[in-house]
């Protein structure tokens, strides 16, 4: 781990994959639990701020920039104190993690699945939410590298992507939004996806209940962001 104090209010920390491994953390571990992210970032702050110049009641911002080699973390303080009333109004107690919006949705565990109720194909070839089940593909991937390759190849349109780990294997679930894509277009995208894995008999409901969701709603976009 490398640390650079940019100024009195900002510290830059470079964490390699080995540093993350020593702490029992991977980038994927940070995707699903906002409290885990906050706890991890504060543990890093405790390590690098040996002089305790960042007071515990000051507002702190964590800006994370992941890469294939690890991640870079900018820790900044505003110099303003967090009073009790402000703390009561926020779960994060003055903490902010700055990442692109769709990555923020992954980190905070936001779920857009309520947009995916019941889908079908209408006379124009488009998915109709009122008439039939969802158009969905559950893909079993040989390894994580195949997922990265798939993310680099497929620009998903009219749907969402969720990545799960179940029984030491990775599964990608592609679900297509109602009224946004024709059945032919959906099947074309599924054909591309199946070049990187095998169609699985498991359902997304089984994976959701018994597996571990690693990336939610925008798994392909998230992978392209983190693993450039």
From Swiss-Prot:
Check the UniProt entry and state the signal peptide residues, or none.
Answer: none
GO terms of molecular function: protein-macromolecule adaptor activity
Gene3D superfamilies named in the record: 3.30.70.1950
Q: Where is this region: Disordered?
A: 79-98
Compositional bias (Acidic residues) at which positions?
A: 85-95
Subunit info?
Answer: Homodimer.
The record describes the protein's role as: Enables the recognition and targeting of unfolded and aggregated proteins to the ClpC protease or to other proteins involved in proteolysis.
UniProt record similarity statement:
Belongs to the MecA family.
Q: What is this protein called?
A: Adapter protein MecA
Q: Which gene encodes it?
A: mecA
């Amino acid at each position: 781990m490398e640390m650079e104090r940019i100024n009195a209010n900002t510290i830059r920390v470079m964490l390699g994959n080995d540093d993350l491994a020593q702490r029992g953390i991977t980038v994927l571990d940070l995707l699903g639990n906002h409290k885990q992210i906050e706890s991890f970032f504060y543990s890093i702050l405790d390590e690098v701020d040996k002089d305790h110049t960042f007071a515990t009641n000051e507002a702190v911002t964590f800006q994370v920039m992941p890469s294939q080699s690890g991640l870079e973390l900018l820790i900044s303080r505003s110099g303003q104190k967090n009073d009790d009333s402000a703390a009561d109004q926020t779960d994060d107690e003055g903490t902010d993690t700055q990442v692109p919006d769709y990555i923020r949705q992954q980190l905070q565990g936001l779920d857009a699945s309520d947009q995916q109720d019941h889908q079908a194909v209408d006379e124009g070839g488009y998915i109709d939410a009122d008439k039939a089940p969802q158009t969905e593909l559950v893909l079993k991937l040989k390894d994580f590298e195949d997922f990265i390759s798939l993310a680099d190849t497929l620009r998903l349109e009219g749907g969402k992507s969720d990545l799960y780990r179940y029984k030491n294997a990775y599964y990608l679930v592609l679900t297509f939004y109602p009224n946004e894509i024709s059945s032919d277009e959906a099947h074309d995208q599924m054909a591309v996806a199946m070049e990187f894995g095998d169609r699985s008999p498991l359902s997304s409901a089984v994976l959701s209940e018994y597996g571990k969701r690693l990336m939610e709603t925008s798994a392909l976009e998230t992978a392209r962001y983190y693993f450039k």
